[in-house]
Amino acid sequence: MASTWFFLLALLAVSISNAFASDPSQLQDFCVADKMSQVLVNGFACKDPAAITVEDFFFSGLHMAGNTSNRQGSAVTGVNVAQISGLNTLGISLARVDYAPYGLNPPHIHPRATEILTILEGSLYVGFVTSNPENKLFTKVLNKGDVFVFPQGLIHFQFNYGTKDVIALAALSSQNPGVITIANAVFGSKPFISDDILAKAFQVEKKIVDRIQAQF
């Protein structure tokens, strides 16, 4: 009898863990984000259906190139729930990424989304790194029409090694995928992470850490 109860409890635990391991299913056609609501939820509260218009499902602007006049030489134009309220609860978003010659989308992660990247113009060198302990690097040169997947939560990058502009379109599996740029987070946090900690982590002298932090 005890073994039967143990089996049932184990089965219940597995069922509960599976239930909470993914986003809940939609219970209605859509839930347009009410960005003025004071209700605090994971995402946005739903807008009054009577106030929803077609504009809640529309965005215009991906035909325009982003401004790549920056130190990295790249620009990301995001289309997520912040731009299209109708994306709320739908689990998807887009981004146009522009790369100047030798432009870089530096190593970063999306904590809440897998990314699938399509090259619209030009060629890119892309890659991602697996988790500890292997930290295996996967890289590929992509050309126009090629598609590449960056798994959720893994560090990845894109580099335009050529002399012409590159355009790519990224689809992400979250209405709000988030982004953490590794260098910015490690060396540009507010306040700074102690240079004692970073010097030991990277096995360099503190003055080198201080010099890097000064760039942020």
From Swiss-Prot:
Keywords: Apoplast, Disulfide bond, Glycoprotein, Manganese, Metal-binding, Secreted, Signal. Disulfide bonds join C31-C46. Pfam families: Cupin_1 (PF00190). Glycans are attached at N67. Residues 1-21 form the signal peptide. Gene3D superfamilies: Jelly Rolls. Mn(2+) binds at H108, H110, E115, H156. GO terms for molecular function: manganese ion binding. May play a role in plant defense. Probably has no oxalate oxidase activity even if the active site is conserved. This is Putative germin-like protein 2-1. It comes from Oryza sativa subsp. japonica (Rice). The lineage of its organism: Eukaryota, Viridiplantae, Streptophyta, Embryophyta, Tracheophyta.
